[in-house]
Amino acid sequence: MLLLWVSVVAALALAVLAPGAGEQRRRAAKAPNVVLVVSDSFDGRLTFHPGSQVVKLPFINFMKTRGTSFLNAYTNSPICCPSRAAMWSGLFTHLTESWNNFKGLDPNYTTWMDVMERHGYRTQKFGKLDYTSGHHSISNRVEAWTRDVAFLLRQEGRPMVNLIRNRTKVRVMERDWQNTDKAVNWLRKEAINYTEPFVIYLGLNLPHPYPSPSSGENFGSSTFHTSLYWLEKVSHDAIKIPKWSPLSEMHPVDYYSSYTKNCTGRFTKKEIKNIRAFYYAMCAETDAMLGEIILALHQLDLLQKTIVIYSSDHGELAMEHRQFYKMSMYEASAHVPLLMMGPGIKAGLQVSNVVSLVDIYPTMLDIAGIPLPQNLSGYSLLPLSSETFKNEHKVKNLHPPWILSEFHGCNVNASTYMLRTNHWKYIAYSDGASILPQLFDLSSDPDELTNVAVKFPEITYSLDQKLHSIINYPKVSASVHQYNKEQFIKWKQSIGQNYSNVIANLRWHQDWQKEPRKYENAIDQWLKTHMNPRAV
């Protein structure tokens, strides 16, 4: 505990160091070093007011003071692997074809880090990567492939909380701390000796909820797990209990998600508040790991020469809209943190432009002075955060006034497309006709409780036309539908005679085993209905 408090005090002390040093740093002879820290499941709204009032995040606040924070940053796909594939490739999800957690980039895909290495950067990666194909559980894959099947099965256990009643327990997520230690040691023992600039990536699993190993009724449940040390960083009075629409009034895709996540039952206000409090405590632990990197850079006299970027692959619903996890275009799931500080980055700047994770790739190359490829979906963020960029009109024209996010994975029974503009969020599904779209005015309805698509048909039509100009989403949906069938058939054939037993014992086993033949028949019927994506 003492060491952590020393770290926090040191961080506060850093805020008053080197006044006016930004102009000198940007003129440094060699390209700056770059550190990218990416956590999992971090709600971006916690990095600015009023969300920032609910939990103490001293190092994120330090980055806000010393750098630029993007107030409207979004994931390009609110699930781990597809989101990270977009970030490492600079391409939208329909271009990477990273449809679910099983299908990501080819292991040999050229990432921004590969390009920087070819241009003289020393490179290193630690922790969670999760952007290549072939990972995650069988259950996760099968649930994604069969989301179009005409059945409704609970795929998750009821979300839970678990508290370590120890005020001195700081290192709760041991694996993340171990990876943070590795990154710090690399900075101390390797990076400090380099004459060339370096780029290092640290991937954290927090504040992603933990899988529960327990059997019984809540087998497979996700657990929000923390200690008293971190829970005391949370302002419980500031925790907001989210409003829920009645089950009968939920959008059909939302209802499917809520049901498969086992969230359609009764939850007390205490349960909901605990889940949210424990989640925020996990965010505080994440912030401390980010702080270890910042403090190491400071102690090694590298902070003045290094651009530090912090973001997350997606957010966490934490019981908003009667759901946990992500897999949704609602703000808690799709809105991510994005902060930058270092040489040439304007201090104390808050950027309201909409940006997304595909912008990381061109930003990295721009920092290194490397020409940008023409095929990227993203745009460099340096013009929006630079100390020296003066032409505001030109800045607005550099990054388009919209971002695209899409989802094709498990727990959602239709391909989903989100277009975020100034204050509008438009969400289209599947072929654009079979499922009602959603439109939210975030300026008057930040909690996204009122779908105004019918109320404002002209805006709905205009945004749908814009979405069509970016992506032929009915065709993409058909392609994903066909991919799901093909992959399921391959998997089923690989299982052979054990198929019935294996599929009955995946995460949905409690519901499946009540009527196994009914659900197998539903899959058989689905497989008989073939689609040709080229016909759309």
Curated annotation (Swiss-Prot):
The domain of life is Eukaryota
Summarize tissue expression: Expressed at high levels in the placenta and pancreas. Expressed at intermediate levels in the lung, brain, heart, liver and kidney and at low levels in the muscle.
Question: Which InterPro entries does its entry note?
Answer: Alkaline_phosphatase_core_sf, ARSK, GAG-degrading_sulfatase, Sulfatase_N
Q: Which residues carry this modification: 3-oxoalanine (Cys)?
A: C80
The cofactor binding remark recorded in the entry reads: Binds 1 Ca(2+) ion per subunit.
Q: Which UniProt keywords apply?
A: Calcium, Disease variant, Glycoprotein, Hydrolase, Lysosome, Metal-binding, Mucopolysaccharidosis, Secreted, Signal
Q: How does activity depend on pH?
A: Optimum pH is 4.6.
Q: Which residues bind substrate?
A: K128, H251
PTM summary from the entry reads: The conversion to 3-oxoalanine (also known as C-formylglycine, FGly), of a serine or cysteine residue in prokaryotes and of a cysteine residue in eukaryotes, is critical for catalytic activity.
Q: Which Pfam families match?
A: Sulfatase
Task: Provide GO CC annotations from the record.
Answer: endoplasmic reticulum lumen; extracellular region; lysosome
Look up the record and name the cofactor or cofactors this protein needs: Ca(2+)
Task: Enumerate the GO terms in the molecular function aspect.
Answer: arylsulfatase activity; glucuronate-2-sulfatase activity; metal ion binding
Q: Which residues cross the membrane?
A: none
Primary location group: secreted
The UniProt annotation places Ca(2+) binding at D40, C80, D313, H314
**Signal peptide bounds:** 1-22
* Reaction(s) the record says it catalyses: an aryl sulfate + H2O = a phenol + sulfate + H(+); Hydrolysis of the 2-sulfate groups of the 2-O-sulfo-D-glucuronate residues of chondroitin sulfate, heparin and heparitin sulfate
Q: Where in the cell is it found?
A: Secreted; Lysosome
In this protein, the residues bearing a glycan are N108, N166, N193, N262, N375, N413, N498
Q: SUPFAM superfamilies of this UniProt entry?
A: Alkaline phosphatase-like (SSF53649)
Residues annotated as catalytic: C80
> Which disease is given in the protein's UniProt record?
Mucopolysaccharidosis 10: A form of mucopolysaccharidosis, a group of lysosomal storage diseases characterized by defective degradation of glycosaminoglycans, resulting in their excessive accumulation and secretion. The diseases are progressive and often display a wide spectrum of clinical severity. MPS10 is an autosomal recessive childhood-onset disorder. Clinical features include disproportionate short-trunk short stature and skeletal, cardiac, and ophthalmologic abnormalities.
Protein family according to the UniProt entry: Belongs to the sulfatase family.
Identification of the protein by name: Arylsulfatase K
Q: Which organism is it from?
A: Homo sapiens
Give the gene that encodes this protein.
Answer: ARSK
